[in-house]
Amino acid sequence: MTDPIADYLTRLRNAIKAKHRVVEVPASNLKKEITKILFDKGYILNFKFVEDGPQGTIKIALKYDLVNKVNAIKKLERVSTPGLRKYTGYKEMPRVLNGLGIAVLSTSKGVMTDKEARDLKIGGEVLCYVY
């Protein structure tokens, strides 16, 4: 697999379109950090790391509106790819949907949202947009 983050986002996207309640994805440290951000920002209901085998998996409970059956995540968009890395400074940091969405960045201080990176005045690699 050449791009594990794109695979992670695609598995989430497919589970949302199929209206699944839980999705399992292969685990890595970067995927765990992205999942924690999605949980903290309220895009997913819950997650659990399951150690089975050398890699382990992450079980993610997706969040749906009970009345309208609409998911909390409208779009997951991969920005930086292995073939074309996208880096940004804190001054040029993208605002996703004018601040309604989040950009997930990999910085020297770890994986964080665009707002956290802007507050710390550090740039990094833009991994994905979530809204």
Swiss-Prot record:
One of its GO terms (molecular function) is structural constituent of ribosome. GO terms for biological process: translation. It comes from the Bacteria. GO terms for cellular component: ribonucleoprotein complex; ribosome. InterPro entries: Ribosomal_uS8 (IPR000630), Ribosomal_uS8_CS (IPR047863), Ribosomal_uS8_sf (IPR035987). Keywords: Ribonucleoprotein, Ribosomal protein, RNA-binding, rRNA-binding. Signal peptide: none annotated. PROSITE patterns: RIBOSOMAL_S8. One of the primary rRNA binding proteins, it binds directly to 16S rRNA central domain where it helps coordinate assembly of the platform of the 30S subunit. Part of the 30S ribosomal subunit. Contacts proteins S5 and S12. PANTHER family: 40S RIBOSOMAL PROTEIN S15A (PTHR11758). Belongs to the universal ribosomal protein uS8 family. This is Small ribosomal subunit protein uS8.
